[in-house]
């Protein structure tokens, strides 16, 4: 998802899927104005006749031509602003390759002629949005999850861990376990339905085994009405789906769960700051929106941490957009000296981004 808007607003004024679609066959849509490419919701709605591409994989931009199309669409169609009139704050994934930051900087100044820009790490903005400058952020979106320890506003790169398990994988897993119940979801359109089921009905169990016992009765069953009016029933799938965050083996992955990854991240930090990290575990991103996730995280971290350690999980209700809300940073008076200006860029080239944004 691409989230855009104006610094200081309460929420992004536009949120659309970061996809670019191109017609599979030219000349099929006779009489319609045939565009070479479609972005976001329009690509999503016309997906039957398009080939869809995701320029962002696991949080990192891999296709710059398509990314440029997404930014163009954001400025001109969504926000309806001239990019040369506004400074731009972009966000990047933790551990984003250096070449990528330079490429983002170059496109903003050379293609869009922005007067100034800044690149901020997503997790750092989430932490700012929660009103903190020290803590560990567990950020989980659609394509990737990260645990990012931050001390006094600086991310600690040696302790950042990445987990390629996020919302998309959970949707796929839910598709799989619903198939075992006899419901078949296969196409991309049906995948969107399953994503909706996941967002509306899934939750994290505090004790998975106990919940499985409870679920043998129909106490936990919920019904969901499909777009065609058919009603399906979903039971233990509701908590089996997000359980994969804590037990990636459900997906056939050998990695540690989000609780263990958070713990491992903290253990890579200096012993003197661990207490501050344990006491400020901030959840962010759409995949942390499951009910029950904060309590479960607390329980699992408490089991891993030293027994005297005070653990606090912060799960703000608006955490789906907390990275975006952290962009309030750009409207602070103290931030104005931090922008990379067009003059600085012209003088130093794209590598300026490493000196000014960290």
Curated annotation (Swiss-Prot):
GO terms for biological process: phagocytosis. Its main location: cytoplasm. The keyword Hydrolase applies. It is an enzyme of class 3 (hydrolase). One of its GO terms (molecular function) is myosin binding. Coiled coil: none annotated. It catalyses: ATP + H2O = ADP + phosphate + H(+). Keywords: ATP-binding, Cytoplasm, Cytoskeleton, Hydrolase, Nucleotide-binding. Actins are highly conserved proteins that are involved in various types of cell motility and are ubiquitously expressed in all eukaryotic cells. Multiple isoforms are involved in various cellular functions such as cytoskeleton structure, cell mobility, chromosome movement and muscle contraction. PANTHER family: ACTIN. Belongs to the actin family. This is Putative actin-23.
